[in-house]
């Protein structure tokens, strides 16, 4: 389908194989991608948009039905209704350049300012009316890689829209077209004479009628210079394909006039003249003057087709350029001013965007503040509830304190009563001890009296009884009787007093029971208060959580306030410097922009001059070669003339030939002079451009001094980008020269250089494509990724050094292709590593990757074709055709040509894939990542093909140039050698093929099928995904710097409002903190009171235990008193008995002494009494012995057997120990553990072995583990000792809290009780022994105050014996 026959309303069918049909709704240029696009409306919802792309609408349709495609991706199946024929249909053919220039003014309806500017610059004269549709050279040369057959088919199909896309058979095919890319300003000088019109509307391309030049490279700079003139309005450098696409769009717009509807905007634009401003008029005039130079470069293809008029037009533009230098300067100044205004407008837009961002941030902060206020409301309500609860708790605590005070007073009264009861009990105990002592004394005296009476009565005569001793004894008895009566009265009185005290103590106990009940109630209340306190603590914890939030908010507000202060200071500084900085900034920006524009212009000039210098160098070499040939010819002709004149045998024909040769010599001399003049002009231009390049370089060095310091951080990354571009250019340069050497005439015997050159071409293609990938990745990466490219600058230095060395080798004609290919392997490894490190795995990089693989496939196939062609020429040179091998030679030639043609066909398919991928990249589309495996397989297959072809060629070269061989070669040996090489280079082949190149062709067919699949896949838009192109990092950096300089105008109001909010929040937080601190103090006071109450409760428990012990002791004392009463009654009865006996004996004595009673009866009574006394003595001795035995047995059982029966004293159901006892047990166990740890620490302590330290001072400074150093050893032991001391201190503190501190009364009593238990004494008595006069002291006597320790029965008997002996 031709691109020039597309019109709105046509029905088309997509060429992707899906069979989808659609209607054309829009044709023209778009803003989202360069070139001409066709907007279509599909019949099914398989599209991508609704007629709008990136916010700009081109036509209207439903969502999912619209799509934009290239004009080459569909076929027209139906035409819209034909428009009425215009009156000015047929025009003169001589106005063709005007129509071409007028066609450049056609644009789509939505035109921005940049497009309008380009329209005005490129269209100096509008077209007065429509022209008949016809083809031109611009439509044919749209793509540099398009074949001439396809271009001719496109041209023929555009002439008749009703025909299909197949080429016409009547159209005469043009010759091979040159690869010129004329710009929009091409005039009639570049086209040659117009062809003669035929009966059909189709015409031959004007460019194709001109003879072709033998060198393709000579025509390349023409398109480059032409595209430069078209691109100077936009001030940017692009690929030559872009300019070609713009030319093709112009051709399409020109041919659309005949088929578009009358209502289209394009026809309106072509019918109405476009007004031109003075600047545009000057630009148009300049383009008219400069156009013939570009046209001449493109039109003069061969020396034979050059006319004198054309020669004149090649010199005229140079003089016109020099005459219009001032006009050009003026135009450049106006363009610079326009660019400055555009940049200012962009800055204004950026400022507006920053203002919108600040407004969005303000709204965001307002929303945050509102949310915080909403969050604060429940917290404030909760704090008020907590305050109310805290007040209630304080009231309850106040009531509890009052109750506690009442309980304290009650406890103090109970304590006083208890102390009084204790004092009373002690007094009673002392009195009881005194009574016991008196009782014992009385018992002893009674026994002594009994013994004295028995002794006195034994053998005493009545006279003796009547003596003074008896009377004294009677008096003593009287005293004793009185003492006993007095003692009885005292004991009765004491008993009454004790009973009264017991009654009072019982009353105290009853009162204590009531106090105990009150204590239990107080405990319950205390538990309730503790629960309330726990609730309050939980509430306080919740409040503390809110406090943490408040603190975090406070910190944020403080940080924001600091930032606000800093910003305010910065704002003040900026405002103070604003007036001064405005003019400086404007001047600086103006200078920077102008310098940047000059830099860009100089860079483009340098590139163009370098390209032209290369072309001039090539042309000079060609001219020198031609000159040398001409000189040789002149010398040969002169020698021939001399010979002919000397021989005098010149005939008439020979004279005519001589004349013709002389004329040819004169023509050649004229051509040599013309070429010499051209070379001189080119040399002058080259020197001028070199001077301009040096000037641009110096200007760049000056401009660098004005760049800001921030450029230094990205300098290496920028240099890395430029180095990648240099490497790509140098690799392409080497590739081109090596390809020329490979395609040239090979030197006999050195065909292996061609094969090595093919290998080097493939590797250089890889390097160039990889550098292009890096350039694209750097141009669309983020700032962070851009900063990471600075290391690549130094890593690529050896690569550039190697490329420079090979370029020097090319200059010296000393390039070693094999060495270059081997060294490129290291370069490929290095750049592969860099790609893995830096290139990201996104869709854009994937698109670059598959494009690179497609380029490598194309290069591999081209190398394979060149290798096969070279080996064919080598075999034909070495083995001349003879009669026998004629058929084999022809067969070999046909097979080789078939291999080359099929390889080149596969290369054409690969080129189609490359173009499709490039088209997708321009539309920001990429294939899906799942297609990577297919591309890798295809690339591997083509690489294997190229390697196989090179290996076959190298093996054949080694075989055909074998030293010492004298036998002639034949084609059978060549065939066997090719089969061996193919088998060796493809180990996967099953068996050697019988025919030539069968293995290669099988591999080639597989590769061709895969490449065809890839080509169809690349043209299928359903298999693509769209990706976003991020702006260049230097644009992002400049925007960031500009944003950092701009300050929002309403920032002061925002700061002031935020400052007021922060101050208000700070005041509220201070009030809350004060309230919380007051509550914390109150809580601590309550906790201290609770601790005091707990201590008092523990004291009450101790007092209760002491009271129970006192009760038990009082009961024991009461039992002892009752026992003493019984014993006293028994003693009194014995006393009465003895008194009765004494009175009877006194009566007997009185009767015997005075009256003379019967002596016999008294004697018998005395004898009976004596017997009775003896029996009583014996009984007393037996009883004493029994008592001694029982005492000894009791002491033995108490000391030895009592421990075995202690379990009997334990209760069957053990009482649960109190909390205090449990704590004591725990503290005791912990104390034992502390002691064990102390013993373990002492036993495990070791002295550090200083012998393990290194002897040398150098070794001591080396690193070694910290555990091997003596400092760590000592610190570890000190740490263990401090931890043990801290543990010991904590245990001691708990012992003090539990009341077990040595030195307290309770501890002393317990210790005393333990000592009393441990003592081995049987009894401790206080006995008042009689003195020397036989009297018993009552205190203060000579026998009082002595203490005797009685351990056993023997001591007691000896004491009794001493008493008897003393008495």
UniProtKB/Swiss-Prot annotation:
GO cellular-component term (any): microtubule
Record-annotated CAP-Gly domain positions: 28-70
Compositional bias (Polar residues): 150-163
Pfam families registered for this protein in UniProt: CAP_GLY, Dynactin
Ranges of biased composition (kind: Low complexity): 88-99, 132-149, 164-190, 243-259
Xref: InterPro entries: CAP-Gly_dom_sf (IPR036859), CAP-Gly_domain (IPR000938), Dynactin (IPR022157)
Region (Disordered): 76-318
UniProt superkingdom: Eukaryota
Record's keyword terms, sorted: Coiled coil, Cytoplasm, Cytoskeleton, Dynein, Microtubule
Coiled coil feature spans: 321-598, 637-698, 1039-1199
Entry keyword Cytoplasm: yes
Gene Ontology biological-process entries: establishment of mitotic spindle orientation; nuclear migration involved in conjugation with cellular fusion
Localization: Cytoplasm; Cytoplasm, Cytoskeleton
Record family assignment: Belongs to the dynactin 150 kDa subunit family.
Job of this protein: Required for the cytoplasmic dynein-driven retrograde movement of vesicles and organelles along microtubules. Dynein-dynactin interaction is a key component of the mechanism of axonal transport of vesicles and organelles.
Assembly: Large macromolecular complex of at least 10 components; p150(glued) binds directly to microtubules and to cytoplasmic dynein.
Name the UniProt record assigns to this protein: Dynactin, 150 kDa isoform
Species in which this protein is naturally found: Neurospora crassa (strain ATCC 24698 / 74-OR23-1A / CBS 708.71 / DSM 1257 / FGSC 987)
Lineage: Eukaryota, Fungi, Dikarya, Ascomycota, Pezizomycotina
């Amino acid at each position: 389908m031709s691109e020039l026959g597309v019109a709105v309303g046509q029905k088309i069918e997509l060429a992707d194989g899906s069979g989808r049909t659609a209607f054309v709704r829009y044709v023209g240029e778009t803003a989202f991608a360069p070139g001409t696009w066709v907007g279509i409306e599909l019949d099914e919802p398989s599209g991508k948009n609704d007629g709008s792309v990136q916010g700009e609408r081109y036509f209207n349709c439903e969502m999912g039905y619209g799509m934009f495609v290239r004009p080459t991706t569909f076929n027209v199946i139906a035409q819209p209704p034909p428009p009425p024929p215009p009156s000015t249909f047929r025009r003169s053919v001589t106005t063709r350049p005007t129509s071409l220039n007028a066609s450049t003014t056609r644009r789509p309806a939505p035109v921005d300012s940049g497009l309008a500017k380009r329209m005005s610059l490129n269209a100096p004269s509008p077209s007065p009316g429509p022209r008949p549709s016809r083809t031109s050279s611009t439509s044919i040369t749209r793509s540099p890689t398009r074949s001439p057959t396809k271009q001719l088919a496109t041209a023929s199909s555009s002439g008749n829209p009703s025909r299909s896309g197949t080429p016409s058979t009547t159209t005469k095919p043009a010759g091979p077209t040159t690869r010129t890319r004329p710009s929009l300003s091409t005039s009639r000088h570049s086209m040659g004479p117009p062809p003669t019109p035929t009966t059909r509307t189709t015409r031959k391309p004007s460019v194709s009628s001109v003879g072709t030049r033998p060198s393709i490279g000579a025509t390349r700079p023409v398109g480059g210079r032409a595209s430069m003139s078209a691109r100077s309005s936009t001030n940017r450098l692009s690929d030559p394909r872009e300019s070609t696409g713009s030319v093709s769009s112009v051709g399409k717009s020109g041919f659309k006039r005949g088929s578009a509807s009358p209502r289209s905007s394009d026809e309106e634009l072509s019918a109405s003249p476009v007004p031109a401003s003075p600047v545009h008029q000057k630009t148009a005039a300049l383009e008219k003057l400069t156009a013939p130079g570009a046209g001449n470069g493109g039109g003069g293809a061969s020396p034979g087709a050059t006319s004198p008029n054309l020669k004149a037009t090649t010199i005229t533009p140079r003089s016109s350029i020099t005459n219009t230098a001032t006009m050009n300067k003026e135009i450049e100044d106006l363009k610079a001013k326009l660019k400055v205004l555009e940049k200012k407008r962009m800055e204004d837009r950026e400022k507006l965007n920053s203002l919108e961002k600040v407004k969005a941030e303000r709204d965001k902060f307002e929303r945050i503040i509102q949310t915080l206020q909403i969050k604060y409301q429940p917290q404030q309500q909760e704090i008020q509830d907590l305050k109310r609860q805290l007040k209630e708790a304080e009231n309850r605590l106040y009531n509890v304190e009052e109750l506690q005070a009442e309980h304290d007073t009650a406890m103090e009264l109970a304590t006083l009563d208890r102390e009084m009861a204790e004092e009373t009990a002690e007094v009673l105990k002392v009195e009881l001890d005194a009574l016991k002592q008196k009782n014992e004394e009385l018992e002893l005296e009674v026994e002594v009296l009994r013994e004295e009476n028995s002794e006195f009565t034994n053998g005493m005569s009545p006279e003796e009884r009547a003596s003074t001793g008896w009377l004294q004894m009677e008096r003593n008895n009287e005293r004793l009787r009185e003492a006993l009566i007095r003692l009885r009265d005292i004991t009765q009185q004491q008993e009454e007093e004790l009973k009264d005290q017991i009654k009072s103590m019982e009353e105290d106990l009853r009162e204590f029971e009531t106090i105990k009940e009150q204590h239990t109630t107080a405990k319950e209340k205390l538990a309730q208060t503790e629960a309330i306190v726990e609730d309050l603590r939980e509430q306080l914890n919740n409040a503390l959580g809110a406090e943490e939030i408040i603190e975090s908010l406070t910190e944020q507000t403080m940080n924001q306030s600091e930032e606000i202060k800093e910003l305010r200071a910065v704002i003040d500084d900026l405002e103070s410097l604003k007036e001064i900085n405005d003019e400086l900034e404007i001047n600086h920006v103006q200078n920077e922009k102008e310098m940047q524009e000059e830099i860009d212009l100089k860079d483009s000039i340098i590139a163009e001059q370098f390209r032209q210098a290369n072309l001039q160098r090539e042309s000079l070499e060609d001219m020198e070669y031609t000159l040398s040939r001409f000189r040789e010819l002149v010398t040969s002709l002169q020698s021939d003339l001399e010979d002919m004149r000397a021989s005098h045998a010149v005939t008439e024909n020979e004279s005519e030939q001589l004349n013709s040769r002389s004329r040819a010599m004169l023509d050649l001399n004229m051509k040599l002079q013309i070429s010499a003049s051209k070379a001189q002009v080119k040399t002058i231009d080259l020197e001028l451009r070199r001077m301009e390049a040096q000037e641009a370089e110096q200007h760049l060095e000056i401009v660098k001094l004005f760049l800001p310091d921030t450029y230094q951080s990205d300098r290496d990354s920028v240099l890395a980008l430029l180095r990648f571009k240099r490497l790509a250019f140098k690799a392409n340069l080497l590739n081109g020269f090596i390809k020329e050497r490979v395609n040239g005439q090979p030197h006999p015997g050195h065909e292996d250089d061609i094969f090595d050159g093919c290998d080097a071409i493939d590797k250089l293609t890889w390097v160039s494509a990889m550098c292009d990938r890096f350039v694209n990745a750097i141009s669309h990466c983020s700032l962070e990724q851009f900063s990471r490219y600075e290391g690549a600058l130094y890593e690529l230095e050896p690569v550039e050094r190697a490329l420079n060395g090979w370029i020097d080798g090319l200059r010296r004609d000393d390039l070693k292709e094999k060495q270059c290919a081997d060294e490129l392997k290291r370069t490929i490894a290095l750049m592969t590593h860099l790609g893995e490190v830096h290139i990201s795995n996104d869709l854009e990089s994937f698109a670059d990757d598959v494009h690179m693989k497609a380029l490598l496939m194309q290069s591999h196939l081209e190398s394979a074709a060149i290798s096969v062609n070279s080996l064919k020429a080598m075999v034909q040179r070495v083995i001349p055709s003879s009669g026998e091998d004629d058929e084999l030679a022809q067969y070999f030639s046909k097979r080789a040509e078939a291999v080359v043609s099929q390889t080149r066909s596969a290369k054409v398919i690969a080129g189609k894939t490359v173009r499709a991928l490039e088209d997708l990249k321009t539309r920001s589309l990429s294939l899906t990542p799942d297609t990577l495996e297919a591309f890798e397989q295809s690339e591997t297959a083509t690489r294997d093909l190229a390697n196989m072809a090179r290996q076959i060629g190298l093996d054949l070269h080694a075989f055909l140039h074998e030293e010492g061989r004298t036998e002639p070669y034949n084609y059978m040996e060549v065939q066997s050698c090719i089969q061996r090489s193919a088998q060796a280079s493809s180990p996967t082949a099953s068996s050697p093929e019988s025919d030539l190149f069968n293995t290669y062709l099988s591999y080639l067919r597989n590769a061709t099928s895969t490449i065809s699949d890839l080509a169809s896949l690349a043209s299928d838009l359903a298999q693509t995904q769209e990706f976003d192109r991020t702006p260049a990092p230097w644009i992002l950096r400049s925007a960031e710097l500009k944003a950092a300089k701009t300050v929002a105008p309403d920032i002061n109001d925002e700061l002031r409002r935020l400052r007021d909010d922060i101050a208000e929040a700070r005041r509220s937080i201070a009030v809350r903190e004060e309230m919380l601190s007051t509550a914390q103090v109150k809580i601590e006071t309550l906790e201290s009171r609770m601790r005091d109450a707990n201590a008092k409760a523990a004291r009450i428990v101790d007092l209760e235990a002491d009271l129970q012990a006192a009760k038990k002791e009082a009961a024991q004392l009461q039992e002892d008193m009752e026992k003493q009463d019984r014993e006293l009654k028994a003693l009194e009865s014995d006393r009465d008995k003895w008194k009765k006996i004494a009175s009877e004996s006194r009566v007997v004595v009185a009767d015997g002494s005075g009256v003379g009673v019967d002596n016999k009866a008294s004697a018998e009574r005395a004898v009976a009494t004596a017997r009775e006394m003896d029996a009583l003595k014996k009984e007393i001795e037996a009883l004493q012995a029994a008592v001694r035995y029982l005492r000894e047995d009791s002491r033995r059982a108490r000391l030895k057997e009592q421990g075995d029966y202690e379990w009997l004293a334990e209760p069957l159901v053990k009482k649960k120990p109190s909390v205090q006892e449990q704590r004591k047990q725990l503290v005791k166990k912990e104390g034992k553990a502390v002691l064990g740890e102390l013993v373990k620490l002492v036993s495990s302590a070791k002295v550090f072995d200083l012998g393990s330290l290194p002897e040398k001072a150098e070794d001591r400074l080396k690193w070694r583990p910290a555990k091997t150093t003596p400092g760590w050893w000592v610190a570890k032991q000190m740490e263990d000792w401090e931890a043990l001391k801290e543990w010991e201190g904590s245990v001691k503190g708990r012992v003090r809290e539990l009341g077990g501190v040595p030195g307290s009364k309770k501890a002393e009593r317990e210790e005393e009780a333990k000592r009393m238990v441990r003592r081995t004494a049987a009894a401790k008595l206080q006995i008042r022994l009689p003195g020397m006069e036989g009297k018993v002291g009552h205190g203060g006597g000579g026998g009082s105050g002595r203490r005797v320790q009685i351990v056993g029965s023997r001591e007691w008997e000896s004491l009794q014996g001493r008493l008897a002996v003393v008495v």
